[in-house]
């Protein structure tokens, strides 16, 4: 007898049963999304602080409530239940919608920042309090980025709390994102009108040792001198030594903001990545090609600077 259940239903015949905490969390998240949408279209611009608090607290606290309701009552151990069947993490309707929203957000961020004026205005109170400068689309992006790493990092810890390594790694990458990539640069802008990123150095920051960039950094006095020396030490001493002993994971999984977002917010989607040998070969070619271009470009500019423009004019 064939026991397979072949359903013709347009709806999910076996929906996930959400408990009370999960439903409360989803409701709070929905309020945060509503506040975000109102701010984006410019509604309630005179209540920027209220919209900001309701957005960040709604998304943050709502997410934590939902994740605690999901993992808090379960025993320790890897839990990837329904990852291949969830609409949002298996190329379903919610996944496509999320992809379109995120793509639209990035297009607006880089090419049409004027369409983000509502969000920029919402973050004005926080930017003035923290940085002492007007808000910008990059401050909006950095704040959302940091909130995503922190909230999804706590979720990751709940999910992988049986692994001490994963817990420590997540705490580390969340710390570097919050302190070194968001809070410290903001404080430095307020104190010195300069925004250093101490975890971002050459060749990852490809123009970090361009002559014109070094000249600009050194114009910021002793802070600039420290940043230049710090970057050179990390590039030519710290990175080779740490990579020799630990591989690239010391940076990509423990320090880097990109890796932080991938390991936290990207965790539910990691099964979608191409794990074929062909994909790995393409990745190697791209990485080494880009590194080669950066090396050549940097060397040409340094030689040209030493020759006082005699090479490139």
Q: Where would I find each of the regions flagged by the language model?
A:
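Non-ligating segments of multi-cofactor redox enzymes
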Residues: 2-313
């Amino acid at each position: 007898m064939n026991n397979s259940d072949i359903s013709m239903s347009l709806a999910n015949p076996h929906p996930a049963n959400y408990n009370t905490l999960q439903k409360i969390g989803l409701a709070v998240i929905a309020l945060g999304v509503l506040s975000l949408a109102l701010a984006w279209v410019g509604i309630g611009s005179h209540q920027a602080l209220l919209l900001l608090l309701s957005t960040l607290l709604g998304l943050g606290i709502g997410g934590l409530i939902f994740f605690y309701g999901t993992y808090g009552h379960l025993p320790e151990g890897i839990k990837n239940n329904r990852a291949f069947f969830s609409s949002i993490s298996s190329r379903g309707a919610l996944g496509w919608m999320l992809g379109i929203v995120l793509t639209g957000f990035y297009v607006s961020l880089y090419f049409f920042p004027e369409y983000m004026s509502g969000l920029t205005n919402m973050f004005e109170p926080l930017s003035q309090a923290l940085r002492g400068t007007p808000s910008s689309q990059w401050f909006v992006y950095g704040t959302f980025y940091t909130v995503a790493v922190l909230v999804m990092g706590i979720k990751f810890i709940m999910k992988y709390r049986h692994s001490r390594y994963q817990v420590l790694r997540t705490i580390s990458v969340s710390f570097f994102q919050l302190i070194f990539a968001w809070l410290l640069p903001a404080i430095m802008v307020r104190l010195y009108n300069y925004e250093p990123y101490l975890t971002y150095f050459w060749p990852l920051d490809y123009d970090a040792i361009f002559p014109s960039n070094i000249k600009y950094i050194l114009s910021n006095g002793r802070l600039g001198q420290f940043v230049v020396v710090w970057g050179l030490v990390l590039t030519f001493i710290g990175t080779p030594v740490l990579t020799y002993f630990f591989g690239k994971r010391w940076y990509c999984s423990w320090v880097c903001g990109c890796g932080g977002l991938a390991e936290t917010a990207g965790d539910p989607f990691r099964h979608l990545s191409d794990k074929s040998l062909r994909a790995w070969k393409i990745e190697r070619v791209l990485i080494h090609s880009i590194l080669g271009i950066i090396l050549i470009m940097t060397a040409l500019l340094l030689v040209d600077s030493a020759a006082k423009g005699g090479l490139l004019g």
